[in-house]
Structures are given as structure tokens and as C-alpha cells.
């Protein structure tokens, strides 16, 4: 189109040749936080993602590299999956700094006979967001309080913990 080429997912993935269950990915793809972000909406029970997910991750995709580790299917731990990666942290927008965000998820998923499956996971996000002003807000008790950071252009810590079950 007149604005150039656009894409949703563009990455290279290298799978391990032995188990074909672990891989290294680099490019633009879904972040490994929670259950909903990693899956297409066609695979979810509702047509839209939860509002809280859309708030924290307005564009589900980000530029980064991720390692996925899984054991062989014959292992007693084959139901576990670890995804961990470094991401630009600004979705699919232009990169503005050299800081990277760490996102990881340890998940478990197992079939229940032929009719269903269960899953659970723990996610962690650690990164920074640029603050172009001298002001910031921090939580004190059950409300936000304005705080003077002293200088313009500081980076604020961005840290999320997540639990999911399905």
C-alpha cells in the first residue's frame, strides 16, 4: 500500500533437531505473557481478549528473541513449557532506546482423556518505560500520589506478575 509493507508476524524460528519441541525465535511475534496473548483469538473461547490484557499489551506483538524449552514427549515433565525472551518493549512501534524487556512464562498443559485439557501458568514481565516529564505517580496505600522525579527523561520500572488457569 502507499504506507509501505505491513505484517502481523514476521520471525525466524529454529527448532532443535532431536525433540522438535524446543526452539529459538527472533523477529516480530506474540509476547509470552499469560495464556491469551500467545494464542489467536480464533483459539480462545471469546472473540476478544480480556480488557486488562488489551490495556497492558495494546499490540500483542513485539520485536524480540525468545527461547522455548520443552522436554521429549516421553518425559514425565513433557506437559511443562518454558518461554523466555528479550523484547524491545514498545510493541511494533519504532525502537527508541537500547533497553530490552524480559518476558517469561512457565506453563503446564495436559489432556483430560479425549474430551478436554487443563492448563496453568505463571508469567513475569520486567522492563522499563520512558517518562518524558519530571513527574510520576506511585501507589501509596490504595491511591496514587504524584512524585517529582527531579529530571526529565527518566525510565520507570515496568513489572508485571501473572497467573492463569484454564
Label each PLM-derived region with a short phrase.
Residues 1-92, 96-103, 107-114, 119-124:
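Outer membrane beta-barrel
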Residues 90-166:
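Surface-exposed beta-loop-beta
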